[in-house]
């Protein structure tokens, strides 16, 4: 048997086994979507997924997360799926829509169902390497669940050689998968800037030190970080999402607060941008007779896909009937980035629309059910590629014919 023939054979076998799991996976997706749980409270979600997974080796991780090993001892390939939902009131009108004020508006229900389908497929049909399923909590908030998983040491203890993840992406055409090497998502830090002034009657501004005016100038001046501090060829974003000050129209408050996000695709540029943000806040505050307090909450690093893993996965995607789209790089962030810091890893972006009719984190976000199939196939492509690269004898581990190589 030739090497290519063997690869085609195992791909066909696993593809058929995967398709056999899709009805069960779709039912799981509906159940998960109807019962979303917020970050840190994903116990029911974890139980619903674990009840559908094979494997006898189950361990808790990161408080409400879990690890499930499929296959025997030895080096393994890991796949990640996120457990948490968002505090959004759903308005999709689906028969299985959530009604508890939370919502799977970022596709985590699809990711979980796809990972469950892959795990059952590998268990039933056999795979080239053991599979470690990582059910990760707290992707949408801090502290990061992925960071807790990596710092716990469980991945090296399970002999994990590579990590695969997938995320639905409405800006990418349905049926396409973006599979790029290098940095594909930005580092993301949150910041809080508090301007402290001297309040008083709005009719006597000369007797006050106005923190609202100081905060407004800061909000405008902070945009100069992008145009005058950041390297112009490195994608950088400063967005202020919250401004809060006072309660009365005729009174100047003592305090005004801004909250926002600072994002860059350069890890080395990150400390410089944080420092410049603080300098601008302090300088603007002094100009207005106020003081500034700046707190930066460091988030995930840039997400850097392994180039070799991306290259080989692209080939397997074609063999599984998926098109390769992209490149797709954005200043979005995902704590999957922590996995890319400690081992070869790949995040795949699975197209679910036309970029117009659906948006992530929107109360009407609802990818079609067939997205479970395309996401599961994308994960299968990554799993096969990782086994080919990092397996002790590549995909020929089952071949039995050294001429395959």
Where do the protein language model's features map onto the residues?
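N-terminal hydrophobic/helix-forming segments and targeting peptides
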Residues: 1-30, 34-36, 371-405
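Acidic/His- and Gly-rich active-site-bordering loop/insert found
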Residues: 5-105, 109-129
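Electropositive phosphate-/nucleotide-binding environments in soluble metabolic enzymes
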Residues: 8, 15, 19-22, 26, ...
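Divalent metal-coordination and catalytic microenvironments
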Residues: 32, 79, 108, 133, ...
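Histidine/acidic-residue-rich, glycine-tolerant segments that coordinate divalent metal ions
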Residues: 65-66, 86-89, 93-103, 109-110, ...
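Non-cysteine beta-strand/loop elements that form the S-adenosyl-L-methionine
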Residues: 78-80, 191, 347-352
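Metal-dependent amide/peptide-bond hydrolase catalytic core
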Residues: 216-405
């Amino acid at each position: 048997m030739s090497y290519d023939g063997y690869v085609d054979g195992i791909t066909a076998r696993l593809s058929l086994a995967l398709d056999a799991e899709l009805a069960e996976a779709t039912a799981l997706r509906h159940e998960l979507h109807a019962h979303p749980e917020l970050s840190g409270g994903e116990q029911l979600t974890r139980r619903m997924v674990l009840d559908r997974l094979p494997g006898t080796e189950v361990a808790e991780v990161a408080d409400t997360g879990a690890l499930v090993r499929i296959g025997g001892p030895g080096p393994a390939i890991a796949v990640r799926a996120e457990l948490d939902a968002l505090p959004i009131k759903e308005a999709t009108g689906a028969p299985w829509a959530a009604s508890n004020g939370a919502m799977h508006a970022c596709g985590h229900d699809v990711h979980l169902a796809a990972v469950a389908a892959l795990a059952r497929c590998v268990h039933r049909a056999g795979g080239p390497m053991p599979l470690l399923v990582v059910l990760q909590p707290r992707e949408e908030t801090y502290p990061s669940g992925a960071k807790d998983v990596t710092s716990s040491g469980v991945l090296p203890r399970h002999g994990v050689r590579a990590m695969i993840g997938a995320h639905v992406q409405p800006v990418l055409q349905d049926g396409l998968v973006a599979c790029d090497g290098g940095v594909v998502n930005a580092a993301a830090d949150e910041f809080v800037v508090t301007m402290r002034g001297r309040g008083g009657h709005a009719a006597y501004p000369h007797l006050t030190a106005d923190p609202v005016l100081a905060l407004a100038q800061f909000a405008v001046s902070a945009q100069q970080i992008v145009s005058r501090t950041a390297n112009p060829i490195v994608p950088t974003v400063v967005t202020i999402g919250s401004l809060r000050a006072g309660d009365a129209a005729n009174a100047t408050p003592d305090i005004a607060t801004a909250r926002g996000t600072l994002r860059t695709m350069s890890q080395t540029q990150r400390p410089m941008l944080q420092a410049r943000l603080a300098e601008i806040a302090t300088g603007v505050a002094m100009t207005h007779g106020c003081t500034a307090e700046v707190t930066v909450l460091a988030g995930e690093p840039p997400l850097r896909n392994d180039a070799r893993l991306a290259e080989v996965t692209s080939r397997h995607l074609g063999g599984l009937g998926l098109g390769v789209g992209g490149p797709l790089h954005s200043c979005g962030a995902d704590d999957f980035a922590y996995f890319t810091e400690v081992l070869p890893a790949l995040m795949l972006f699975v197209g679910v629309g036309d970029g117009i009719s659906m948006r992530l984190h929107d109360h009407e976000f609802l990818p079609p059910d067939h997205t479970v199939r395309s996401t599961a196939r994308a994960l299968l492509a990554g799993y096969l590629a990782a086994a080919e690269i990092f397996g002790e004898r590549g995909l020929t581990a089952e071949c039995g014919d050294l001429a395959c190589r």
